[in-house]
């Protein structure tokens, strides 16, 4: 029953609490003459290095936690970057939203797996063979993975760790288990899947077979989500309100940070969020063409 709480009153009561974080100005040290494009995705690896997936000339850029440039993968075969996760295997799993595909890459940029993108043709909502503007990926404890699909389709796709299709669920709508722009997915330590139902402005929770467990409403528009196990919290970027939000496991807002703007610490279309092992938070922005780092 606790998962079913909409948390309307609790969210209102707790939303004024500001998260105890401050921005690290000019965190990312790009090589001279370089710039990001629209930053659609950010992820941290097992060494707390940071990967930025962007729509500029250097598609994937790696930094250490202090913002030191490590390397760039500029020849990645994608039409338009979107989501990124570092898998339990240490490889990079990226979503090409315009190419309707998922790519698994080694940290050196070698393509290890491709799903979708057959002839760059989108798949409809009933097809098990592809996507239509997919968005991101999440990994279950058994290393099976789940892809949110997406801007046009309204479903979640499950695959075995080897990339074999297992199941799918969802359709366009506002009911339980229905979606309107499935924009991100992440697991908690209990193996529950959280789905950012962006245009419905809620997060839905499922088991690994697609059984509906609950929903969180009155939280804003979830564009990007990540789970931070030491706090047992979900961190979210609310792109409609240009802010960062922290949620407890009852779906209550326990803190927010940020507002609209271009100055350090402000947001303009925050699109993706990642939390490293120390609790530092990284936010990728579409309109501001940057990734900001926040620390306590």
Question: Which residues make up each language-model segment?
Answer:
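A generic membrane alpha-helix/interface feature
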Residues: 1-3, 167
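Sec-dependent N-terminal signal peptides
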Residues: 3-12
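Eukaryotic scaffold repeat domains enriched in small/polar residues
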Residues: 16-296
